[in-house]
């Protein structure tokens, strides 16, 4: 049986569903898993999940088998009871678009409800029979094949079916193509809408949606509503890792909305009964001219959070403004404990959210090329003092290998120009995805950091990015000695001569590189994926919101001008 016809592409619909799957699910059941597209993507986010699929199309099921842990081929209505799943073990139930293919969806929902944990989520995509394209096609006599869909569902009937099955819908989102043609449709149907006594606004909403994304839960307790709103002041540096990816994961938690904007913010986006967090990412607040911004947030009942992942001493403006960026907030989130210790002298309410990776791609054969000459990666900002003393060694080793070793450099043009080889590539500062692609094309990563205060407070993000990308690292002890097991998950150098020795070793010993890559990859997979930690943020924000009376008193003592 063919799935319901959509005007949107299958890929875009799968991507929409992927946004809402809880990133830390231990067991997922997808009914109508197709060729395993969602499972394949999700397994990079959470490789430890047990992903079970059911598919009636044998060919699609065959293609999906490699992506899923288990798959059952057969008619959902007839065969669902044969699934090897214990009651109350499923964290997320997904219906792609096949719920309407089932003659009695309520029966299936009831059965699946028995498999769900108390806090499990249900995700469903439902085609909208009132979509304006469908109405036009019907009027033209081009109604879609009725055999494709056995059970048309409206939003109201869907809510009834879910309630009967003991499931509570807590959110419905719409997707659909609008544009000029939709506006023409509304204009043409306006007399009919008025003649039938229909509400124009409701009609517009109902006909604009090609399909609904329905989110439900087994729990009868409504989720606590939270808006996480971030103003990104430095999108190029760590905006993805520190804001965008955590936001995506937080948005999978029932009741959580996330909004991020660059350098501007609308403070009127909160919904009724929604608690609010406002996060300043890498923001230098001016004293006293920016006090009014903080006052506005206090008046709107926001929890005010500063987000910083680099040492403030790099920017004298922080001190020049009496560290208002941290003193003027309720609390601070940062990336390392050493940085947190520094920040606590300006605000005692500091928490560490380590940098984690949102996904980990599969290691493949391209990670271990057969040719004998590896590629070297170097990519960093403000590192000249860190690499200066090892540059002669790098050039000597490149020369010893007759310039057959390729070096790829991101952003650091001086490092690139200092390389005495023609076998090199330079890339300017680039988008995060492109950065990861370049990184994954290399074999050895160089991570030098001198032992100075600013460097001591940096995170180990570069190492975990290399490890997840199949790149063996040669790193300084500063920052990395506490994370890298020397000789197992990477190599640590303690002097220039030690760097030379270990760099040569990594270049000529392919077996050593492979062993390091595999062990580092597995360490990151087991310890440093965002799916293992993302709920900490939401839990901490809610805890801080509960503590707002205390936090406001402390804030008043630090910056009394905010309350005058």
Place the predicted regions along the sequence by residue.
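A charged, aromatic-enriched C-terminal amphipathic alpha-helix characteristic of glycosyltransferases
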Residues: 360, 508-550
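Extended catalytic core of nucleotide-activated donor transferases of GT-like folds
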Residues: 96, 259-342
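Conserved N-terminal segment of class I S-adenosyl-L-methionine
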Residues: 1-88, 185-186, 209-212, 233-245, ...
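S-adenosyl-L-methionine-dependent methyltransferase catalytic module, highlighting the catalytic core
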Residues: 103-111, 121-220
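Conserved acidic donor-binding segment of nucleotide-sugar-dependent glycosyltransferases
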Residues: 486-497, 505-511
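N-terminal pre-catalytic "stem/leader" segment of glycosyltransferase-like enzymes
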Residues: 219-285
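Nucleotide-sugar-dependent
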Residues: 314-315, 385, 433, 437-438, ...
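Conserved catalytic-core segment of nucleotide-activated headgroup transferases in glycan assembly
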Residues: 232-255, 359-360, 369-440
């Amino acid at each position: 049986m063919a799935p319901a016809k959509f005007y949107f592409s299958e890929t875009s619909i799968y991507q929409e569903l992927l946004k809402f799957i809880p990133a830390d699910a231990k067991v997922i059941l997808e009914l109508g898993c197709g060729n395993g597209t969602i499972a394949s993507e999700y397994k990079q986010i959470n490789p430890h999940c047990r992903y079970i699929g059911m598919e009636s199309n044998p060919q699609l099921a065959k293609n999906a088998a490699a992506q899923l842990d288990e798959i059952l081929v057969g008619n959902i209505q007839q065969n669902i009871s044969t699934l090897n799943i214990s009651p109350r073990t499923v964290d997320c139930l997904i219906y792609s678009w096949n719920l309407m293919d089932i003659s009695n969806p309520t029966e299936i929902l009831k059965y699946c409800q028995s498999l769900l944990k108390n806090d499990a989520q249900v995700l469903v995509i439902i085609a909208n029979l009132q979509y304006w394209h469908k109405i036009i096609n019907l009027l033209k006599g081009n109604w879609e094949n009725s055999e494709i869909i056995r059970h048309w569902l409206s939003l109201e009937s869907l809510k009834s079916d879910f309630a009967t099955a003991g499931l509570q819908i807590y959110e419905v989102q719409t997707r659909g193509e609008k544009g000029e043609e939709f506006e023409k449709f509304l204009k043409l149907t306006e007399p009919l809408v008025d003649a039938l006594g229909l509400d124009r606004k409701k009609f517009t909403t109902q006909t604009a949606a090609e399909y609904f994304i329905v989110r439900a839960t087994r729990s009868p307790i409504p989720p606590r509503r939270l808006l996480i709103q971030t103003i990104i002041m430095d999108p190029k540096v760590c905006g993805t890792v520190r804001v965008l990816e955590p936001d995506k994961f937080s948005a999978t938690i029932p009741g959580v909305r996330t909004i991020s904007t660059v350098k501007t913010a609308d403070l009127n986006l909160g919904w009724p009964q929604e608690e609010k967090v406002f996060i300043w990412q890498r923001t230098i607040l001016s004293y006293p001219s920016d006090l009014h911004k903080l006052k506005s947030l206090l008046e709107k009942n926001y929890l005010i959070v500063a987000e910083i992942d680099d040492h403030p001493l790099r920017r004298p403006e922080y001190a020049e403004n009496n560290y208002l960026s941290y003193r003027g907030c309720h609390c601070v989130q940062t990336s390392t404990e050493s940085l947190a210790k520094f920040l606590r002298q300006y605000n005692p309410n500091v928490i560490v959210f380590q940098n984690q990776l949102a996904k980990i791609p599969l290691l493949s054969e391209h990670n271990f090329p057969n040719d004998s000459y590896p590629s070297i990666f170097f990519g960093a900002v403000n590192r000249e003092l860190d690499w200066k003393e090892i540059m002669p060694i790098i050039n000597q080793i490149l020369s010893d290998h007759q310039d057959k070793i390729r070096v790829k450099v991101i952003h650091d043009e001086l490092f690139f120009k200092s390389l005495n080889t023609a076998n090199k590539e330079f890339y300017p500062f680039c988008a995060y995805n492109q950065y990861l692609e370049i990184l994954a094309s290399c074999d050895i990563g160089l991570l030098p950091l001198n032992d100075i205060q600013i460097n001591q407070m940096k995170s180990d993000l570069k190492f975990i990015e290399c490890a997840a990308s199949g790149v063996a690292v040669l790193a300084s002890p500063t920052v990395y000695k506490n994370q890298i097991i020397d000789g197992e998950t990477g190599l640590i150098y303690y002097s220039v001569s030690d760097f030379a020795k270990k760099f040569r070793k990594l270049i000529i010993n392919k077996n050593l590189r492979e062993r390091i890559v595999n062990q580092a990859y597995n360490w990151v997979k087991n310890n440093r994926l965002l799916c293992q930690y993302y709920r900490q943020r939401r839990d901490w924000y809610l805890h801080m919101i509960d503590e707002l009376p205390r936090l406001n008193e402390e804030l008043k003592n630090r910056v009394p001008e905010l309350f005058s």
